[in-house]
Amino acid sequence: MASCVTGTEAAIRAAACRDGEEASHLKIVAVFAIFLTSVFGVWGPVLLAKYFHGKPLYDKAILVIKCFAAGVILSTSLVHVLPEAFESLADCQVSSRHPWKDFPFAGLVTMIGAITALLVDLTASEHMGHGGGGGGDGGMEYMPVGKAVGGLEMKEGKCGADLEIQENSEEEIVKMKQRLVSQVLEIGIIFHSVIIGVTMGMSQNKCTIRPLIAALSFHQIFEGLGLGGCIAQAGFKAGTVVYMCLMFAVTTPLGIVLGMVIFAATGYDDQNPNALIMEGLLGSFSSGILIYMALVDLIALDFFHNKMLTTCGESGSRLKKLCFVALVLGSASMSLLALWA
């Protein structure tokens, strides 16, 4: 629980850091720096897919990048977004009021975010099942290992064209799933990117903004790698790829500009209880979405259902270890940024 007592030394330090003119200059720098690093991060995997698709080790490289990105997204939700949401709702100006002091709303809204992401997943999966042309089972049957050849079930009377149709159907379902993952992931990222941008845009604290520029630039690179890796595998049309990458790149900078406009128009106080409540609730909701996406649609899907990682033998074992190391490095690198942002 946040303390309601403000020390004299802390108050003096806060007053010295509050410089609207310098803060505005820093925020303009932040807009361009974060935009450029976002473009670099999200377009990296997409360009890799465009120019190296079909080359040796391409699929493995994309998988390793995706596992690194899953670690980044998991750390973003648990180390960055969720603690800030709890902190906002635990502030003494909020936690001293009803109903905020009576119930842990941050945890509740995080759970709602995760369940909402699950609902979207289930709805889309049901839609794919009915529209996949594979009957009521959606074309995704359980296949005993002894009856599977090359990832396809060998049934009596099925050969040649039948197997090719089944393979194409399964590939299309996988692509649709990857597209859904990319879209829901971007929604979760956009939620908390807007919060980050608007919060920075409204802040007049130069001591807070200065280190945030560097930290958020790295943050956007890592998060962009995560989203870009998913987009690269999803097989979107060129226009959709450009749109999704552009949306990711401009969301935080536009949030900063919006925050500056709100402050200029209203003199908005970022310590206002209503602002803290809104930040806490939106942060909790986006955290729930990101936790679900990282654990279920990225980590579990790749480590337990990807053919390259479930293949028996030394090659599959080495790749699995490499992907696990990438996951840990992604989590650690993003967690380290919590020291500054």
Swiss-Prot record:
UniProt keyword annotation of Membrane present: yes
Main location: plastid
Record's subcellular location: Plastid, Chloroplast thylakoid membrane
InterPro entries found in the cross-reference section: ZIP (IPR003689), Zn/Fe_permease_fun/pln (IPR004698)
A Gene Ontology term for the protein's cellular component: chloroplast thylakoid membrane
Keyword check for Glycoprotein: no
UniProt topological domain (Lumenal) ranges: 83-102, 201-211, 265-280
The protein's role, per its UniProt record: May play a role in the transport of zinc in the plastids.
The protein's name: Zinc transporter 6, chloroplastic
